[in-house]
Each structure stands twice: as C-alpha cells, then as structure tokens.
C-alpha cells in the first residue's frame, strides 16, 4: 500500500519538494488573477476530494484559508472542533484516525499538542496536514516565503530576522532555512529562546541560523523582519512574557536598521502596541495582508501535493 504524503514538519521534506510547492503556488495564484474566490482552478486537482479539518484551537486564517483552498481546487471541506467529535469524550486519536481514513481524503489538524498530529499520522491511511501545533506551523512559513518571493525575488540568499519569542513559527523558519538557502537571525530573550534541537538540526545541515538576545544585531541589514504575538493561546505567564519581551517590539526605529527595502511580516493576529506598533503593521513596509491571503495559495499547493497531483 502506498504511504500517504503527510505535511507535518518542513524538516521531514527536502528542499526540492519545498521549491516545487512554492513554484506551484506562484503559478496558481498568477493564473487566478481577477477571478472570484469560488472559481475552481483549471486542473481541479482536488476534484471529488474531501478534507476534514479538526480544530483544538480557535482559528481565523487557518480555517478560512483551507476551506477556500479546497473549494478553489475543486474539492470540499468538513469543519469540526475536537469538542464536536467523540475525541472530546475520550475516543482515542488512533481510532478517530482510522475512521476518518474511511470517510475523507485528507485531514488537517490544528492541535494543542504536536504529539497528537504525529499519532494521527502513524495510523492514518490518508494525508495528515499540520495546521499548527505547539511545536511548528509549516503552512504559515510556506505562505511567508511565497510572500517574500512575490515582493523581493527568490528566497535563497536572503536574510530573515525573527524578533521575539522563539516559538512554533520560529521553529518552522529554522526548519526551512537550510532547505531553501536563506539566513535566519533570531533575536529572543534567553528565557524564551528557540528550540535547541531545531537549531542543532539546522547546524547539521549547514544552515545559516544564529540566535542572539540583541534585536538590533539580528535586524541590522535583514531583508525581512518577522514578529509574532508574545502570548499564545494557552500561555499562563502573560505578565512575565510581556516584561521579558518588551525590548523586542518592532517599531520604525528597529525597522530602519533593516536593509533599505526591508519588509515586515506577522502571521496575525497581532497585539498592536506589544510586539509591533501600528505604524509598522499598517505602514508601507508591511506585507501582512498579502501574507494572510497567501495562506490560501500556499496551502492549495500543499493539498495538491498531498493528493499526488504534483510532484
């Protein structure tokens, strides 16, 4: 039996596959220029396919973008929360995965625990897609890189500065850096540092990834500056986080240290006045609205790949 193509972590794929997905996303987006959102792509790679979406966390961009993506690929999506399902009453992940494998063509999970997604994938006979976990957010990084390339050309050779909490999104940037050939400079307080195992893996792949506690050093000369919320869903140390991360706010003075055509990204939702100022988020260097839209286009290519329509 052919093993399903799971999309769980970028480091489990190779650079050629990520490049294929990005090129496909660029082409699909360009081909749709001026189309209504509900019009199906010419090749309809998800025709007659059904995607199950399971949410253990609240979602705006992931929920709407995956639903729109499936519609544009010619398929459909079923949306549920864990509390809607028997998962919320004690049915095991393994039993749930076996049942859904008989009813849908792929499962996207936005989970509290990365281990839950891995357990789904171990027994599922259909592709499992990581829509966000506590450990990584690969779909977001594909959208981010798509956005960077739209505005600044190929990602290879670029320098990205991550400023703030070394969280799950930061981890996926670390995973991508050695595979796509960009430099990643991380600035974070020591108490909220990036995952050391991820850093070691990137180093083993000769990735140009570094970490500092100095945001100015990380941002200096960078092509792209990326921030994220300092307090994620489920975090209980709100006050401690704000105190530790206050020096890492991205404002115009920090952005002025970036390259002359440096741009700003944020996966949203943003806590305005905390990790980023209004002036940066709404300013001419911000690409966050294109970035949000590009979740659709990047995920369409992920889905097409999972279904075997490309690659």
UniProtKB/Swiss-Prot annotation:
Gene3D superfamilies: Aspartate/ornithine carbamoyltransferase. InterPro entries: Asp/Orn_carbamoyltranf_P-bd (IPR006132), Asp/Orn_carbamoylTrfase (IPR006130), Asp/Orn_carbamoylTrfase_sf (IPR036901), Asp_carbamoyltransf_Asp/Orn-bd (IPR006131), Orn/put_carbamltrans (IPR002292), OTCase_ArgI (IPR024904). Pathway: Amino-acid biosynthesis; L-arginine biosynthesis; L-arginine from L-ornithine and carbamoyl phosphate: step 1/3. The keyword Transferase applies. GO terms for cellular component: cytoplasm. Its EC number is 2.1.3.3. GO terms for biological process: arginine biosynthetic process via ornithine; citrulline biosynthetic process; L-arginine biosynthetic process. It comes from the Bacteria. L-ornithine binds at residues 168, 228, 232-233. GO terms for molecular function: amino acid binding; ornithine carbamoyltransferase activity. It is an enzyme of class 2 (transferase). The keyword NADP does not apply. Carbamoyl phosphate binds at residues 59-62, 86, 110, 137-140, 267-268, 295. It catalyses: carbamoyl phosphate + L-ornithine = L-citrulline + phosphate + H(+). Keywords: Amino-acid biosynthesis, Arginine biosynthesis, Cytoplasm, Transferase. It is found in: Cytoplasm. Belongs to the aspartate/ornithine carbamoyltransferase superfamily. OTCase family. Reversibly catalyzes the transfer of the carbamoyl group from carbamoyl phosphate (CP) to the N(epsilon) atom of ornithine (ORN) to produce L-citrulline. This is Ornithine carbamoyltransferase. It comes from Caulobacter vibrioides (strain ATCC 19089 / CIP 103742 / CB 15). The gene is argF.
């Amino acid at each position: 039996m052919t093993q399903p193509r799971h999309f769980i972590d970028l480091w489990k794929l190779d650079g050629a596959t990520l490049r294929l997905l990005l090129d496909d996303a660029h082409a699909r987006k360009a081909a749709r220029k001026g189309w209504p959102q509900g019009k199906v792509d010419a090749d309809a790679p998800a025709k007659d396919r059904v995607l199950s979406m399971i949410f253990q966390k609240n979602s705006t961009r992931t929920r709407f973008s995956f639903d729109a993506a499936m519609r544009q690929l010619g398929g459909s999506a079923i949306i549920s929360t864990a509390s809607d399902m028997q998962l919320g009453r004690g049915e095991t992940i393994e039993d749930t995965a076996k049942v859904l494998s008989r009813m849908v063509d792929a499962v996207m999970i936005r989970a509290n625990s990365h281990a839950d997604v891995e357990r789904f994938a171990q027994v599922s006979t259909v592709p499992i897609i990581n829509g966000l976990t506590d450990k990584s957010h690969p779909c977001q990084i594909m959208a981010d890189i798509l956005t960077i390339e739209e505005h600044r050309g190929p990602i290879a050779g670029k320098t990205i500065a991550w400023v703030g909490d070394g969280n799950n999104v930061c981890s996926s940037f670390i995973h991508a850096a050695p595979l796509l050939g960009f430099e990643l400079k991380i600035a974070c307080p020591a108490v909220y540092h990036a995952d050391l195992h991820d850093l070691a893996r990137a180093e083993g792949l000769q990735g140009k990834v570094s970490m500092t506690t100095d945001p100015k050093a990380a941002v200096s000369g960078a092509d792209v500056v990326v921030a994220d919320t300092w307090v994620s869903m489920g975090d209980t140390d709100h006050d401690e986080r704000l105190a530790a991360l206050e020096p890492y706010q991205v404002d115009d003075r920090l952005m002025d240290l970036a390259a002359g055509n440096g741009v700003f990204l944020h996966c949203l939702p943003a806590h305005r006045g905390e990790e980023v100022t209004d002036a940066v988020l709404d300013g001419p260097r911000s690409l966050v609205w294109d970035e949000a839209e590009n979740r659709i286009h990047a995920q369409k290519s992920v889905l097409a790949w999972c279904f075997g329509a490309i690659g």
